[in-house]
C-alpha cells in the first residue's frame, strides 16, 4: 500500500504532469500511516471493527511517544491523535507532548501543538495554566506568524482567571502593523467579552480600542469589530423588557445586595445602548461603502462585496433601530440602496441580503413607503421554483404582517399553495404565517384550517405547535362561547394518548406534558362560571354524543374481535368525566340516556390504561352521578373494592371516599350537591361554630383582628396629623383649569390634600357671582357671538376667529354655574344658526369653510359639540382636538400617500387579473382567510390593532374579570357581616339622629347641584348611597339605613353631635359641612 502510493507520487514528479501543491505539502508533513488510518476507518463495516482499529492505533501512538522520535514524527503522531479524538476516544496520554510542542522554535510544530491543546484539552484543565508561558512568549515574538498562532490558541485556552495576564498585551497588539494581527486581537477581545460579560466593557480604554478598530483601514479588522458590537446589541436590544424583568426581580427579592446588583445591570445596559446608538451613523456609513463596492476585489463573492459583513451590519441596525425613531431615520436611505443593489444579483447571496434587508425594515421603526417596496420585492421569493426561496418569501411575509397586514393580499394565492406544499418546512412556516395574520374576522376559517392540519399531521412537534396556536387564537379572538367550546373540545379529542407506546417512543416530553394544558382548565372555568344554561347543555351534548359513538365503535370491534380502538387522551377523559357528572342531568331526558348507562361506561374507562390521576377524576364523576341517581349500583361496590388496592394513592383515596358515601344514601346530595362547582363557601358560619365550641369548652373569647392591634376603624387623629397623606374618600375636586392658561393644573387632575375653610377672598367672589346672576335676571344682555377656542393638545390652546372647527364658549368654561344664561345663549345661537342655514344651506353649523384644490386632500372636520363643560369628572362634551390647517409640506405628503394607495390598489388588481385561472376552491378559501384584510384596507394598522384589542375580550381576560368581581363581592359581604358583628357586640350608644324635611334647604340643594359647588350633595347624587356610617363617642361604628338620601329626594340630615364627635370625623367631612351641622 505504502509502496504503491510512493510510486504514484514519484511517477507524477518524474513525468511532465504538474503535481498539485497541496499534495506536495501533505507529502512533506505526513507519512502514509495517517493515510492508512483514514482508509481503514472508512472501509470498516461495523462499530466493533472501528473500535478495534482505533485501539490498535492508540497502542501505536503510546509506543511512539515513549520512544525518542524526531519532531516531524511527533508532529505526525499528534495529528493522528487528533483524528482519534474526533471519533470520540480519549487520548490523555498525548496532552503533555502537545504542550512541549508549543515551545518549539519551528512555526509548523508550534501551531500543531496549539491546535492539539485547543481541541483535546477540556475546560479548566490543569495543563491550561502551564500553557500561559508559551502563549506569552508567542505574543512577545517578533515573528507575526507566531503571534497569530498564539492569539488563535487564546480563543480556546483562556478562562476568566487568566484574562488579566493577557489583556494589556492584546490591547497593545491592536496597533500592530500587520492587519491579520489586529484582526485576531479583536477576535480575542470578543472572546474575553463572552467570558466576562458586560463588566468587561466598564473600562473606557477597551471601548476606545474597539471604536478605533471600527475605523480601521483594513476591512477584515473592521468586520471583526462589527461582530462584537452585534453581540452587545443582541443582548441589550430589548432594553425595556430586560429592565422590567429586573425590576420584577427586585420586587420579589428582599436582599439589598441583589437589588444593588440588578440596578447596576440596568445602568450598564443603558450606557452600552447609548454608546451603540452614538455609532449608528458610523455603521450606516460602513454599510453604504460596502454596498457601493468600495472594498478590494479580494472581498467579492459571487459579484457582491463582502456579503457576510453586510448581513452582520443589517442585523446590527435592526437591533439598534428597534422602537427608536431617531436612529431609524438614519437608516432608511442606506437600506433602500442596499435592497436595490441586492436585486441585481440573482444568486443565493443576493437573495440572502435582500431577505435580511426586508427583515431589518420590518423590525426598526416602520416606514410604510419602504415596507410597501419590500412587499413588491417578496414576489422574487414566492415566484421562485425552489422551495428554499419560497420558504424565505413566507418568512418575509410573516415579518411584514406585523407592520401592515394588508400588504399580504397580493400573495394570498401563493400562501394557500404553500399550505398544501409537499415540503414540510415550507408548510410549517406557511401555517405560522396564517397564525400571525389571524384577526377577529377570519378566526373561524383559520382555526378550521389549523385543525384540519392537526388531524393530518404525524409529526408530534408540529402537532404541539398547532395546538398552542389554535388555543391562543381561540382564547384571543373567540366570537362566542359556543364556538370556543366546540373548538377546544375538538382539539382535546384529537390529542394523542400519553400512554400509547408508539407516541412515547417518538416524543416523550410533549406527550407527558399534556396535563399542563391551561386551555382545558379554562374551558372548565368558562362553563362553570357561565350563567347561560344553553352553554352547559351544549357542552354536555357534545361529550354525551362522543360517549355514544365510542360505545358503538367498541361493540362493533368486539364483534369483529379487534382491539384497535383509539383511546382518548387523559386530559380529554378528565374534562369529559367532569362535564358529564355536572351537567348530564340537563339533557338526559332529551337523548334518552340513563345515568346507569353513563356510570357503566365510566366504569369501563377505569379498566383502560389511563393515569392514576385521570382515574381519580372518573371516580369523582361516578360519585356525582350516583348522588343524582339517589341509589347505589352493584357494580360500584366491586369497583371500590378493586381500587382500594390500586397502585395510585389518589385512586385509593377517592374509592374509599366513594365507598363511605355509598353507605349513607341520604347524605349523598349534601356531600355532592348538584351544580355547586362555583358556589362560595360561607366561612363565617363555619368559624362561628368553632367559636361556640371553644366558648363551651372554656376557651378565651375571640377578639377581632382589628381590635388586637388596637387600630381604630375610623381616623380619630388630631389636627396635628392632618397633613399626613392617608387613604380615604376625597370629597373635594379641583377647580376647572383655565383654558387661557394651558400650563395650569395639567399634571394632577385630582390632587389629594386636606380641606381648609374658605377664605375671605373666596367668599367675596361667591357674593359677586350671586350679584351678577341677579343683575342678569333683571337686565338680560344681548347674546354675543361666542369666542372660538381651538384645543390643539395638552399644552397648546389658540384663540381663532369664528371659523373654528370646534366652537367652544369660553364663558361656559370659566363660569359653568350660570345655568340660566347658558339656556338663553343656546336659544339665541340656535336661532342664528337657523337663519344662517337658510341663507347658506351648503355650510351649516358655522363650520370652517375652505376652498381646497382639486389635488389637495379634503380636510377632516369634527362635529360641533353640544356642550363642553367642566364637571367633577372633568370636561363633558366633545373634547376631541380638531386638526390644524395643513401646511404645504403636509399637503404634499398626503398627496403622495394617496398616490401610493392608488398604485398599491392597481397592483393588487393586476395581480388578481394574472390569477384568473385559479381553482375556485382556492379562491373561496382565500376570500375566507384574507377577507378581514380587504375590509380594512383603508384603515391605519396601529389603530386597527388597538380597536381589536379593545373590542375583543379574550376568554382568559373574561375569566379574570369574573374572578375579580367575585372576589370583590365576597370581600364586600365579609365587610358587611363584620360590621354587623361589631354593632351587635357594642354597648348601647346615645345619639340623636333626626331627619327633617326642609323646603328652603331643598331649593338650596337644587341650586348647588346645578352649580357643582356643594360637595356633600354631589356625593349623594352621584353615588346614590343609602348607607351612612357615623362614628359616635370613640371607636364604635353604627350603620344607619337612610332611604331618603337618594338623588331624587331633597331632605336634609341634621345630626346633633358633640365636639369630640366632630373632631373624630373631621377626616371624612369638609370643614364647611361641619360648620353647617354645628349651626343646625
UniProtKB/Swiss-Prot annotation:
UniProt-listed GO biological process terms: intracellular protein transport
Keyword Metal-binding appears in the UniProt entry: no
Organism whose genome encodes this protein: Dictyostelium discoideum
Protein name: AP-4 complex subunit epsilon
Biased composition (Low complexity): 762-782, 801-847, 878-911, 936-952, 962-972
Assigned protein family: Belongs to the adaptor complexes large subunit family.
HEAT repeats: from-to residues: 161-198, 201-238, 369-405, 406-443, 445-479
Keywords: Golgi apparatus, Membrane, Protein transport, Repeat, Transport
Amino acid at each position: 500500500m505504502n509502496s504503491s502510493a510512493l510510486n504514484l507520487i514519484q511517477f507524477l514528479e518524474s513525468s511532465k504532469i504538474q503535481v498539485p501543491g497541496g499534495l506536495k505539502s501533505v507529502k512533506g508533513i505526513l507519512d502514509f500511516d495517517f493515510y492508512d488510518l483514514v482508509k481503514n476507518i472508512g472501509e470498516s463495516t461495523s462499530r466493533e471493527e472501528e473500535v478495534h482499529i482505533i485501539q490498535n492505533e492508540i497502542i501505536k501512538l503510546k509506543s511512539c511517544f515513549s520512544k525518542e522520535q524526531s519532531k516531524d514524527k511527533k508532529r505526525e503522531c499528534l495529528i493522528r491523535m487528533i483524528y482519534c479524538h474526533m471519533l470520540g476516544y480519549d487520548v490523555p496520554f498525548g496532552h503533555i507532548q502537545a504542550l512541549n510542542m508549543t515551545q518549539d522554535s519551528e512555526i509548523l510544530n508550534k501551531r500543531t501543538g496549539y491546535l492539539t491543546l485547543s481541541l483535546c484539552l477540556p475546560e479548566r484543565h490543569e495543563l491550561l495554566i502551564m500553557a500561559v508561558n508559551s502563549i506569552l512568549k508567542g505574543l512577545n515574538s517578533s515573528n507575526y506568524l507566531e503571534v497569530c498562532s498564539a492569539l488563535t490558541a487564546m480563543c480556546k485556552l483562556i478562562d476568566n482567571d487568566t484574562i488579566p495576564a493577557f489583556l494589556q498585551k492584546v490591547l497593545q497588539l491592536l496597533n500592530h502593523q500587520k492587519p491579520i494581527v489586529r484582526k485576531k486581537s479583536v477576535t480575542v477581545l470578543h472572546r474575553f467579552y463572552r467570558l466576562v460579560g458586560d463588566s468587561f466593557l466598564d473600562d473606557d480604554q477597551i471601548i476606545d480600542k474597539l471604536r478605533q478598530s471600527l475605523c480601521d483601514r483594513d476591512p477584515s479588522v473592521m468586520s471583526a469589530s462589527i461582530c462584537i458590537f452585534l453581540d452587545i446589541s443582541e443582548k441589550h436590544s430589548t432594553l425595556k423588557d430586560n429592565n422590567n424583568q429586573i425590576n420584577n426581580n427586585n420586587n420579589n427579592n428582599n436582599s439589598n445586595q441583589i437589588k444593588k446588583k440588578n440596578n447596576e445591570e440596568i445602568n450598564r445596559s443603558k450606557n452600552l445602548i447609548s454608546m451603540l446608538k452614538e455609532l449608528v451613523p458610523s455603521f450606516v456609513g460602513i454599510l453604504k461603502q460596502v454596498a457601493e463596492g468600495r472594498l478590494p476585489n479580494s472581498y467579492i463573492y459571487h459579484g457582491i462585496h463582502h456579503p457576510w459583513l453586510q448581513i452582520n451590519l443589517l442585523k446590527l441596525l435592526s437591533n439598534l433601530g428597534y422602537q427608536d425613531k431617531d436612529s431609524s431615520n438614519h437608516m432608511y436611505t442606506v437600506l433602500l440602496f442596499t435592497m436595490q443593489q441586492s436585486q441585481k444579483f440573482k444568486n443565493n447571496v443576493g437573495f440572502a441580503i435582500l431577505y435580511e434587508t426586508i427583515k431589518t425594515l420590518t423590525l426598526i421603526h416602520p416606514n410604510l413607503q419602504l415596507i410597501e417596496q419590500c412587499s413588491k420585492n417578496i414576489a422574487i421569493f414566492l415566484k421562485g421554483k425552489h422551495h428554499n426561496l419560497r420558504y424565505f418569501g413566507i418568512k418575509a411575509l410573516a415579518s411584514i404582517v406585523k407592520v401592515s397586514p394588508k400588504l399580504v393580499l397580493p400573495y394570498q394565492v401563493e400562501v394557500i399553495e404553500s399550505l398544501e406544499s409537499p415540503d414540510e418546512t415550507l408548510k410549517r412556516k406557511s401555517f405560522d404565517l396564517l397564525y400571525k395574520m389571524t384577526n377577529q374576522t377570519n378566526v373561524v376559517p383559520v382555526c378550521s384550517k389549523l385543525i384540519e392540519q392537526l388531524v393530518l399531521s404525524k409529526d408530534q412537534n408540529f402537532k404541539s405547535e398547532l395546538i398552542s396556536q389554535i388555543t391562543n387564537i381561540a382564547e384571543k379572538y373567540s366570537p362566542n362561547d359556543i364556538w370556543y367550546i366546540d373548538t377546544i373540545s375538538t382539539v382535546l379529542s384529537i390529542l394523542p394518548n400519553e400512554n400509547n407506546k408508539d407516541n412515547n417512543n417518538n416524543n416523550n416530553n410533549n406527550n407527558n406534558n399534556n396535563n399542563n394544558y391551561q386551555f382545558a382548565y379554562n374551558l372548565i372555568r368558562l362553563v362553570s362560571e357561565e350563567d347561560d344554561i344553553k352553554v352547559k347543555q351544549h357542552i354536555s351534548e357534545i361529550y354525551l354524543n362522543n360517549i355514544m359513538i365510542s360505545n358503538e365503535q367498541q361493540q362493533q370491534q368486539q364483534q369483529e374481535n379487534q382491539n384497535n380502538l383509539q383511546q382518548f387522551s387523559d386530559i380529554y377523559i378528565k374534562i369529559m368525566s367532569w362535564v358529564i357528572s355536572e351537567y348530564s342531568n340537563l339533557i338526559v331526558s332529551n337523548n334518552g340516556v340513563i345515568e346507569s348507562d353513563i356510570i357503566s361506561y365510566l366504569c369501563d374507562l377505569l379498566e383502560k390504561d389511563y393515569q392514576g390521576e385521570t382515574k381519580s377524576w372518573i371516580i369523582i364523576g361516578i360519585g356525582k352521578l350516583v348522588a343524582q341517581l339517589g341509589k347505589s349500583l352493584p357494580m360500584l361496590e366491586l369497583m371500590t373494592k378493586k381500587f382500594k388496592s390500586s397502585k395510585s394513592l389518589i385512586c385509593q383515596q377517592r374509592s374509599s371516599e366513594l365507598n363511605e358515601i355509598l353507605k349513607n344514601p341520604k347524605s349523598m346530595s349534601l356531600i355532592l350537591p348538584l351544580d355547586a362547582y362555583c358556589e362560595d363557601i360561607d366561612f363565617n358560619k363555619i368559624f362561628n361554630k368553632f367559636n361556640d365550641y371553644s366558648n363551651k369548652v372554656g376557651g378565651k373569647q375571640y377578639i377581632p383582628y382589628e381590635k388586637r392591634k388596637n387600630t381604630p376603624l375610623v381616623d380619630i387623629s388630631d389636627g396635628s396629623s392632618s397633613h399626613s397623606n392617608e387613604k380615604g374618600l376625597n370629597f373635594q375636586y379641583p377647580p376647572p383649569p383655565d383654558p387661557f392658561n394651558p400650563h395650569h393644573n395639567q399634571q394632577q387632575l385630582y390632587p389629594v390634600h386636606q380641606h381648609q375653610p374658605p377664605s375671605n377672598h373666596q367668599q367675596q367672589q361667591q357674593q359677586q357671582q350671586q350679584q351678577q346672576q341677579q343683575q342678569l335676571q333683571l337686565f338680560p344682555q344681548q347674546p354675543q357671538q361666542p369666542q372660538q377656542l381651538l384645543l390643539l393638545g395638552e399644552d397648546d390652546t389658540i384663540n381663532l376667529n369664528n371659523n373654528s372647527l370646534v366652537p367652544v364658549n369660553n364663558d361656559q368654561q370659566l363660569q359653568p354655574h350660570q345655568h340660566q344664561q347658558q339656556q338663553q345663549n343656546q336659544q339665541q345661537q340656535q336661532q342664528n344658526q337657523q337663519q344662517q342655514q337658510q341663507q347658506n344651506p351648503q355650510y351649516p353649523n358655522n363650520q370652517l369653510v375652505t376652498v381646497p384644490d382639486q389635488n389637495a386632500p379634503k380636510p377632516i372636520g369634527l362635529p360641533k359639540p353640544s356642550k363642553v363643560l367642566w364637571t367633577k369628572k372633568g370636561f363633558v362634551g366633545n373634547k376631541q382636538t380638531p386638526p390644524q390647517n395643513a401646511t404645504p409640506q403636509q399637503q404634499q405628503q398626503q398627496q403622495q400617500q394617496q398616490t401610493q394607495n392608488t398604485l398599491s390598489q392597481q397592483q393588487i388588481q393586476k395581480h388578481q387579473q394574472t390569477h384568473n385561472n385559479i381553482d375556485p376552491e382556492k379562491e373561496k378559501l382565500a376570500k375566507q382567510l384574507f377577507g378581514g384584510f380587504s375590509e380594512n384596507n383603508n384603515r391605519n394598522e396601529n389603530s386597527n390593532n388597538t380597536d381589536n384589542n379593545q373590542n375583543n375580550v379574550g376568554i382568559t381576560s373574561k375569566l379574570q374579570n369574573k374572578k375579580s368581581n367575585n372576589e370583590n363581592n365576597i370581600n364586600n359581604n365579609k365587610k358587611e357581616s363584620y360590621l354587623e358583628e361589631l354593632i351587635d357586640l357594642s354597648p348601647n350608644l346615645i345619639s340623636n339622629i333626626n331627619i327633617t324635611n326642609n323646603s328652603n334647604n331643598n331649593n338650596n340643594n337644587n341650586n348647588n347641584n346645578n352649580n357643582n359647588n356643594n360637595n356633600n350633595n354631589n356625593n349623594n347624587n352621584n353615588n346614590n348611597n343609602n348607607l351612612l356610617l357615623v362614628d359616635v363617642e370613640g371607636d364604635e361604628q353604627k350603620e344607619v339605613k337612610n332611604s331618603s338620601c337618594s338623588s331624587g329626594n331633597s331632605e336634609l340630615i341634621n345630626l346633633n353631635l358633640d365636639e369630640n364627635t366632630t373632631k373624630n370625623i373631621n377626616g371624612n367631612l369638609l370643614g364647611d359641612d361641619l360648620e353647617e351641622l354645628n349651626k343646625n
